[in-house]
Amino acid sequence: MLFTIFKRYVSAYPVGLILVLVFTLAQVMGSLLLPALNARVIDDGIAQGNLPLVWQLGGVMLIVAVAQLATAIIEVAAGSYVSMAVARDIRRDFFAKVMTFGHQEAQTFGVSSLITRSTNDVRQVQQFLTMAMTMMVMAPVMAFGGLIMAFAQDLILSWVIVVTVVILAIVMALAVRGMVPSFQVMQQRIDAMGSVLSQQLAGTRVIRAFGKEDVEKKRFAQANRDMTRASLMVGRYFVALYPTVFALINVGTVAVVWFGARGVEAGTSQVGTVVAFIQYLMLIMMGVLMFAFMSMMVPRAEVAAGRLVAVMDTRVHLDRDSGRVDELPQPGTFEFRDVTFTYPGAEEPVVQDVSFSAEVGSTVAVIGATGSGKTTLAKLLVRLLEPTSGTVLLGGVPIQDISRQTLGTQFGYVAQNPYVFGATVAQNLRLGNPGASDEELWEVLRTAQAEDFVRELDGQLDFEINQGGKNLSGGQRQRIAIAMALARRAPVLVFDDSFSALDTATDLRLRQALSNVSATSLIITQRISSARTADIIVVLDHGRVVGQGTHDDLMATSPVYREIAESQATQEAL
């Protein structure tokens, strides 16, 4: 999957890649040249008393060091730009893909997992790219170049380096082999803890209402312990690895000094050669360490990249960009024509052979017991779901043939559990109509029966609503959501059980105000009081239409409708 990320995103920045590769190579070549120059300074300059040569070689070493600094700055800048640009592009495409998800795809991954993927996984890939672009060139050139230069300095001493490198490579291979599954487990534990925390934050009120704080504390503590154990599992490898690696480096250095000193004493080696050898040993070890570090990062980055690609390559069942129709011949009308819908994996359809229609300016109410398929019809109309069979028409056109841009202007939709954004009242209301004036906002608030409480808020239209409307009551949140839908000035309004948190008096005033709105309305409800004034009432029972007509007609002809009315036992319903 890392190759997929590289192919899609990194390859889009060839100039940055070339700069990183060229200047990293130049930096490593400078590192390989300095020990050889240092050896000449010691053996041919200081040992021979040749001060002009010392000054000459010292000047060359200074130039090389300055050049290394310059190349390192350019390399780091180019590498950082490429990695950050790639991370930006991944986040952009990830978000764009998630925005195309329907109900099925969103449930497949889960909200907490999608958040973790868009943050932690992108960060893992970015960190890997930052390191990899440098280390992929630096590690092999430094290791093999160091070996070649060491062999060129003293063939006899080179066996010390070879033995040390072989032992170090074996240690690293064993460590990486153990770390790969540990990183995978740790990523799973991160997801699990994020899921637990997300559920607890979202369900704080329910947890408190049921007095389950201690239970949830234990559940989070268990997830935290699992995460800690997974982290400690990885940490143990690092704890054992680093002392072992540095011990090997120190032993190799001591061996070079020991055998080098004996060579100097015997006249087969020179002091400068031994010093250069130690420096080359360090460079070789650095190269091996970089390679090992990369090997440890690859599994974690591979897991992260795979999780990102899994989201971005998901085939969306509902293609919202398939439509091409921009003009509707009968705007403000809709029709369900023999519509059946079955959720993936379900044995029975949730709605079956549903047919009804709405004319311009009319109000259609859909009523039925819990689980009868009412919300599914609302989602089918606004195309959050696609019918398994049958056709949903909007403005006389099959809804799948309407372009996404046009479809987005046709509805004011209030979901069953309305969501209010963390922004001011005005910003929420202008979400679907950015050009709406303050007077227009007060007008829709008045219609939604929200004007009185908004005027009492600190700042009124500028009052800051918490994310999800947590600082509003359920009824206030519903009325703000209704006002948001009205502010769109859309030809069709869809209210999915949107009056459930309102008292009977407010519900009545709201319905009276909505009757003056120039729009076709679909009202999903369980209340007879919310449905009785509709032009057409559609009665659903187990996903099928079992009655259709006005309130009086259904009271006379529909046993299901009459049973609902009688069970609510209100004077208005009867």
Residue map of PLM features:
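Membrane-integrated ABC transporters
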Residues: 1-34, 46-60, 75-79, 83, ...
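Juxtamembrane helix-loop junctions of ABC transporter transmembrane domains
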Residues: 2, 22-23, 27-43, 64-111, ...
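An intracellular "coupling" helix at the cytosolic face of ABC transporter transmembrane type-1 domains
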Residues: 7, 12-14, 100-104, 120-129, ...
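Transmembrane helices of ABC transporter permease
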Residues: 12, 16-29, 131-186, 258-269
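Hydrophobic alpha-helical transmembrane bundles that constitute the permease/transmembrane domains
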Residues: 25-33, 65-73, 125-128, 132-144, ...
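Helix-loop-helix
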Residues: 49-53, 149-163, 233-307, 311-312
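ABC-type nucleotide-binding domain
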Residues: 327-574
